């Protein structure tokens, strides 16, 4: 049955997709429901996946639906879902879906404006995964919170931008943040970063 459901997704006809929708509603099998979600993705049926992301009670299936929305670059649907969602766990999945879709703007909005500190920090880390280096540097400059600045440093390491981190290191006056930047630089395979660390170690006090 699972392979048959996936085949219907490949066919992609609206009439055919009614069958997987009915299977999803009727089935108690997580594997079968997962196959139906894959059929929806193969058929580019954003509406059906969004409905699952909104209403599914099984956390794993709901997370998979959100991930598939990201794979379909359904950024508007993810943004809408984020605004209406109250669960932190689900919101993390939505942010990860935005990362899969390469959606910088929505992640940046969450990094700037999300009142939940944990979610804000997650959005900052994911900005590094989508290569939003310039946005992270600017965010660092306007953010005074030490913990969030630490998340930005981590985001820049994820982005592999040692040069930007060196720039922040040279401007930073907080000893704890300077230490964090140095620790992250030491984990990077970056010649310029290694040279900067060596310079600081040999520099006279």
Where are the model-predicted features located?
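Eukaryotic tandem repeat interaction scaffolds
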Residues: 95-97, 122-126, 131, 135, ...
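Mature soluble domains of exported/periplasmic/lumenal proteins and thiol-rich metal-chelating peptides
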Residues: 59, 108, 117, 125-128, ...
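Alpha-helix N-cap/helix-start positions at coil->helix boundaries
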Residues: 29-31, 58-60, 87-89, 116-118, ...
